[in-house]
C-alpha cells in the first residue's frame, strides 16, 4: 500500500519516540529526521533506521521536500522556532503537525475535534501539550453533558522524561494548555499546572482533572461520558487508565488518570511523551488517509 512520506524535526525525546510509532504506521513513511546537533543521538538512531538526516535545521531539508515527496512534517523542537519552521514548509505545501506549545494553528485533541480539522483546509494543527492530551478529553467528557464554568488540570511527570525543550517552554505549556481547556475542552475558564517530579525511581505520569459545573452535576450521565471517553483515548494510548472517579463533591467533578507509555524510546513511566506522540501519529494517519483517498479519486 502506498504511504505518505513525512519528515520529523527535532531528534530529542519526543521526536525519537514519534519515529518509533511512525515506523509501525500503515499509511505514513518517515523519510527525514532534522536536527541541529551533528552528535545528536536521535539523528544517529534515525540513520540506523534508514532515514535521511540533516544537522542544518529545516533549511537542510527544504531542497529535498519536492524530490522526496514530503507531505507531512512533525515539529518536535521548541515554541520559539516553530513559526519559522512552519512558514518555510507550509509554503512548499507540507502539512505541519506541531508538537510544540507554539499553537499558531488550531488545537487538535483527536477524540474531541480531529474530525473537524479533516474537513478544513488547515496547513498547521497544534497538538497542545502532553498535559493537554491527557486531560482535555476528560474536561470535554464533562462539558458535553453540561456546561463547565471552570476546568483545572494538574499534570505530574517524571523529571527524567522532561527534555530541555519542554523545560524552556514551561510558561508556554501552561498558557497553551489553559487555552485548549477552554477552546477544546469546553470550560469557560481553564487553568493548567505542571509538576516535574524528580523522584527516583521515576513515577508514571499522573493527571488530576477538576471541573466545576453549572448547577448540580448529572452523576450518571457524566460517569458514562467519562468512561466512554477513556475508551476513545485507549484506542491510540492503551496505557491511558482511569485510576479514580469521577468523584462528585457539590458542583465539583474530579477525575484521576494515569498514563503509561508503550516503552518505545523511553521507559513506560514516560506516558507524557507517549500520549503526545501517539496523538500526533493518530492525527497524521487520518490526514494521510484523506490524502491517499484524494489521490485515488483523481487517479
Swiss-Prot record:
Top-level taxon in the UniProt lineage:
Bacteria
Instruction: Name the residues that bind NAD(+).
Output: 161-169, 272
Q: What is the main EC category here? A: oxidoreductase
As its record notes, the protein acts as a catalyst of: acetaldehyde + NAD(+) + CoA = acetyl-CoA + NADH + H(+)
Spell out the Gene3D superfamilies in the cross-references: Dihydrodipicolinate Reductase, domain 2, NAD(P)-binding Rossmann-like Domain
Q: Which SUPFAM superfamilies match?
A: Glyceraldehyde-3-phosphate dehydrogenase-like, C-terminal domain, NAD(P)-binding Rossmann-fold domains
Q: Which keywords does this chain's UniProt record carry? A: Aromatic hydrocarbons catabolism, NAD, Oxidoreductase
- Xref: SMART domains: Semialdhyde_dh
Q: Name one GO molecular function term.
A: NAD binding
Q: Which residues form the active site?
A: 130 (acyl-thioester intermediate)
The EC designation for this entry is 1.2.1.10
Biological-process GO terms, alphabetical: catabolic process
What family is it from? Answer: Belongs to the acetaldehyde dehydrogenase family.
Protein name in UniProt:
Acetaldehyde dehydrogenase 2
Query: What is the protein's species of origin?
Result: Burkholderia lata (strain ATCC 17760 / DSM 23089 / LMG 22485 / NCIMB 9086 / R18194 / 383)
Amino acid at each position: 500500500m502506498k504511504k505518505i512520506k513525512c519528515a520529523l524535526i527535532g531528534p530529542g525525546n519526543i521526536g525519537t519516540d514519534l519515529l518509533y510509532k511512525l515506523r509501525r504506521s500503515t499509511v505514513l513513511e518517515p523519510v527525514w529526521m532534522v536536527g541541529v546537533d551533528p552528535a545528536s543521538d536521535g539523528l544517529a538512531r534515525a540513520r540506523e533506521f534508514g532515514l535521511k538526516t540533516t544537522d542544518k535545521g529545516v533549511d537542510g531539508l527544504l531542497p529535498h521536500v519536492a524530490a522526496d515527496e514530503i507531505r507531512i512534517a512533525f515539529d518536535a523542537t521548541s515554541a520559539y522556532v516553530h513559526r519559522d519552521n512552519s512558514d518555510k514548509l507550509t509554503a512548499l505545501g507540507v502539512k505541519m503537525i506541531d508538537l510544540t506549545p507554539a499553537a499558531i494553528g488550531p488545537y487538535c485533541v483527536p477524540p474531541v475535534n480531529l474530525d473537524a480539522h479533516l474537513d478544513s483546509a488547515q496547513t498547521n494543527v497544534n497538538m497542545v501539550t502532553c498535559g493537554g492530551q491527557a486531560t482535555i478529553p476528560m474536561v470535554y467528557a464533562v462539558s458535553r453533558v453540561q456546561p463547565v464554568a471552570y476546568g483545572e488540570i494538574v499534570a505530574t511527570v517524571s523529571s527524567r522524561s522532561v527534555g530541555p525543550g519542554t523545560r524552556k517552554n514551561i510558561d508556554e505549556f501552561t498558557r497553551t494548555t489553559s487555552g485548549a481547556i477552554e477552546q477544546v475542552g469546553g470550560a469557560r475558564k481553564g487553568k493548567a499546572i505542571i509538576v516535574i517530579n524528580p523522584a527516583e525511581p521515576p513515577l508514571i505520569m499522573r493527571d488530576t482533572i477538576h471541573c466545576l459545573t453549572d448547577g448540580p452535576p448529572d452523576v450518571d450521565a457524566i460517569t458514562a461520558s467519562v468512561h466512554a471517553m477513556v475508551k476513545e483515548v485507549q484506542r491510540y494510548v492503551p496505557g491511558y487508565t482511569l485510576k479514580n472517579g469521577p468523584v462528585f463533591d457539590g458542583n465539583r467533578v474530579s477525575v484521576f488518570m494515569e498514563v503509561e507509555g508503550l516503552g518505545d524510546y523511553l521507559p513506560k513511566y514516560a506516558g507524557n511523551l507517549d500520549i503526545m506522540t501517539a496523538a500526533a501519529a493518530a492525527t497524521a494517519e487520518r490526514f494521510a488517509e484523506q490524502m491517499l483517498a484524494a489521490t485515488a479519486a483523481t487517479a
